[in-house]
Amino acid sequence: MTLKDLNIGETAVVGTVGGEGALRQHFLDMGLIPGEKVTLVKFAPMGDPMELSIHGYELTLRLDDAARSWVTLAKAPAAKKAEAESEKPVEHPGLGEGGRYHTKKGENPLPDGTTLTFALAGNQNCGKTTLFNQLTGSNQHVGNFPGVTVDRKSGAIRNNPDTEVTDLPGIYSMSPYTSEEIVTRQFIIGEKPTGIINIVDATNIERNLYLTMQLMELDTPMVLALNMMDEMRGNGGTVRINKMEAMLGIPVVPISAAKNEGVDELVDHALHVAKYQERPGRMDLCGEEDHGGAVHRCIHGIIHLIEDHAKAAGIPVRFAATKLVEGDQRIEAALKLDQNEKEMIEHIIVQMEQERGLDRAAAIADMRFHFIHQLVEQTVVKPRQSKEQLRSARIDQFLTGRYTAIPAFVGIMALVFYLTFGVIGLALQNLLEVGIDALTAAMDSTLTAWNVNAAVHSLVIDGIFTGVGSVLSFLPIIVTLFFFLSLLEDTGYMARVAFVMDKLLRRIGLSGRSIVPMLIGFGCTVPGVMASRTLPSERDRKMTILLTPFMSCSAKLPIYSLFAAAFFPEHAALVMVSLYFLGIAVGILMAILLKGTVFKGEAVPFVMELPNYRLPGLKNVVQLLWEKARDFLQRAFTVIFAATIIIWFLQSFDLRLSLTADPQQSILAWLASGIAPLFAPLGFADWRVSTALITGFMAKESVVSTLTILYGSSAAFAAALSPAAAAPLLVFCLLYTPCIAAVASVKRELGGKWAFIMVANQCIVAWLAAFGTRLIMML
């Protein structure tokens, strides 16, 4: 019997785990090991993938993986006895505290003035970034989707200038499966921080502690932060901190990062262990008597063989030994073992497999989880079922239900766009426009009264106020869109969307996880491209990155608003929503084309955690909105301001650098006329339009300011083009190359070759789509 054969609600025990390579290692690291209980929770609305419950959290898996290679199932064992609460109290070990762990005489602190560097490491979605913000005062994006931190961020701990803490992408183990996991592993092993702050979700402690076991093997000063303890206590659970600290040999501090509880104590312990280089008191997780001692003898035999190699490579020997058993090729290459040593190690591992009755990777995973089970049984009093889990289950009945999930997704996205473009965002935009118009009129009157030079007057009013002001008026719409997208992410709904849409996206060659970078792309292409790092497959990453720019970013909203109001005022909201769906449709067609040509093959297995729904914190939402507004304002007063000044200058002066009142005699007209013929078949061969498209490569918002400056006003622009020409131009703006910042992010992720291919491809697609629109409008 395989995992696929389970019925909803049935529980069984894992017999064997199939698969191979990094994928199988990832399954083991996620807790799917022989002897572990697993429960089928439900299937996705389209029947695939499935949702499993293991170690107290939810995991997704596709049916073909379950049927082909996952498990054989045995009879479920009897339930374990409840944790005892009546054990004798354990004296506080005092790890990470002065005068308790070591004597004054035995101290060997780092020199004063040494910068203490910390790696903030933990599983995805455990609250790392929230803790980072509390530690440093930085304003990193806080979300509720696995992989919010897609690059490492650093900052000094408050009131401790000689420190640097780095927020690393979340990982489940030190066996890298995705590019973000590689970032974390390379930092911890390669840059050797003076200390590690390991944050653990106390409500999901078994799965989180798996990474802790591996971090302890690095022999780096370390403190364990038990996050979300307020939730655990609120559900009737608790953790015997003293006992856990004694068993692990590292300081354990209960905290609530969201409420800033226990953070000061955590900082004190972290500074102490780093300053005095107090290393973990325990690294050996398997005793000589555990399962006959097979794994213990294997690891220690390998340690004896590779000790000199590990020291030369700068890799902790215990960590190197366990990774060699798991078959980690990167570690093996770094150790530079000769052939004889490799054969001896292989002989030791094979003997262990025979004695233990498990393959090498499963034996190491079992060793860690066996210790975790012992630790949890002695230190954790679990609640029967948390309020957060019950609430999530009730919400999921509707949002991931068989008949309700797709309508719910469509309805939610439609509501987001309607409120953004038709109600809240529009009302705020109109209000801001009134203020900008009043300020412009007042400045115009002031400059006239002061008899300011005509050129300067034109620069200030026609260039700065008209150009930048027209872009600023769209700030409310952009902020409103980001507000709703952040709500979807913070609550945990984004992860459900990936679960619901996986089967559909597989048909066009993508994974369900690809939906999240593309949804983020509706806000801005740059973070959407960066979010693709959460995808484990290079193929999936490239496809997702190339498709994300087809999701219309918020910077294009000013263009849509201008065109819709000028040419289609009676159907403005419909036109704007239709553009979004057109971008999605073109992206789907491109995905199908790429799947059949450049990126042949299937998407990688869909393995992802489904976090509990959480109410977004008001502070986090306001913080995110401020970041987006600030970013937009910075762009408005830097890139867009500079582009506006340049456009004004090129428009106001001729080739002899003489001020001209005739725009057709300007330098700008001469430059733009060179590419204008390319757009003649599309119905807009006007040099002013060509100029706007060029400036749009710098920043999409510049298209509006450029058109407003060159035509003099929105009304003049509306009079210059017919709807039959405006529609193709609108489609071209939707689909042509993203801004320079987005292109730079693609270059950073995939290299210059793919960035150029993306720009060329989108320009060609945009031209063809605009030409088709022109033909339709001429009917």
Where are these regions (language model features)?
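Conserved G1/Walker A P-loop phosphate-binding module
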Residues: 92-173, 191
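Conserved C-terminal guanine-recognition region of P-loop GTPase G domains, centered on the G4
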Residues: 160, 185-252, 559
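Canonical P-loop GTPase G-domain recognition
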Residues: 232-285
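Extended helical scaffolds that flank P-loop GTPase cores
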Residues: 249, 276, 283-453, 659, ...
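Extended, low-charge hydrophobic alpha-helical regions
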Residues: 355, 362-366, 382, 423-464, ...
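Hydrophobic core segments of alpha-helical transmembrane domains in multi-pass membrane transport
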Residues: 408-419, 481-486, 564-566, 579-593, ...
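Juxtamembrane inter-helical linkers in multi-pass membrane proteins
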Residues: 434, 438-442, 495-525, 600-624, ...
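Transmembrane helix-loop junctions at the membrane interface of multipass transporters and ion channels
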Residues: 550, 554-577, 741-751, 770-779
